[in-house]
Amino acid sequence: MSVLVPMVVEQTSRGERAYDIYSRLLKDRIIFLGSAIDDHVANLVIAQMLFLEAEDPDKDIHLYINSPGGSISAGMAIFDTMQYIRPDVSTICVGLAASMGAFLLAAGAKGKRFALPNSEIMIHQPMGGTQGQAVDIEIHAKRILAIRDNLNRILSEITGKPLEQIARDTDRDHFMTAREAREYGLIDEVITKRELPAK
């Protein structure tokens, strides 16, 4: 199935310039994560972050999230890049931030993590499946438990919640409204209107 990407036409001193909508948003330092997170999506998001850092290392990047989650390794690559680059990454949930999407939402710069009022945020423990010989299954089980412990530790640091509470809350799908996510410490503010930039 092919996806249609809207085009935006702008007038410049050299005439008209057409951009796909994502390139136009990038000019305003906006990255839109609007799908499941896999290696391809992670590489695109990371490349955009690195580009924006090179453009201006002191200006915030705005990461809009509407994602059901996805690959842990791909999501952690985005997470690590968010911590690595110099600009603050402001996160904004529009719609759904679930699983790794919620993790990335919470990983935004403190004071700059937002959700629109009807957003839904969901945290849970990592899921995985494997097959093969018993020893291989044991190796994978140990790995996913280590990943779970690492994700819980990071969420505990981000939210200020005790590790034991994070472990309980992520044991099953834990859905939250935007306001509940704010109380939990995953975001800083529920926003309804974008503030106009100062003139």
From Swiss-Prot:
E.C. no: 3.4.21.92
One annotated Gene Ontology cellular component of this protein: endopeptidase Clp complex
Active site feature: 99, 124
SUPFAM superfamilies: ClpP/crotonase
GO biological process, alphabetically ordered: protein quality control for misfolded or incompletely synthesized proteins
Record's keyword terms, sorted: Cytoplasm, Hydrolase, Protease, Serine protease
Subcellular location: Cytoplasm
Pfam families attached to this UniProt entry: CLP_protease (PF00574)
Broad enzyme group: hydrolase
Catalytic reactions on record: Hydrolysis of proteins to small peptides in the presence of ATP and magnesium. alpha-casein is the usual test substrate. In the absence of ATP, only oligopeptides shorter than five residues are hydrolyzed (such as succinyl-Leu-Tyr-|-NHMec, and Leu-Tyr-Leu-|-Tyr-Trp, in which cleavage of the -Tyr-|-Leu- and -Tyr-|-Trp bonds also occurs)
Major location (coarse): cytoplasm
Function, in words: Cleaves peptides in various proteins in a process that requires ATP hydrolysis. Has a chymotrypsin-like activity. Plays a major role in the degradation of misfolded proteins.
Subunit (UniProt): Fourteen ClpP subunits assemble into 2 heptameric rings which stack back to back to give a disk-like structure with a central cavity, resembling the structure of eukaryotic proteasomes.
Family that this chain belongs to: Belongs to the peptidase S14 family.
Protein name per UniProt: ATP-dependent Clp protease proteolytic subunit
Gene responsible for this protein: clpP
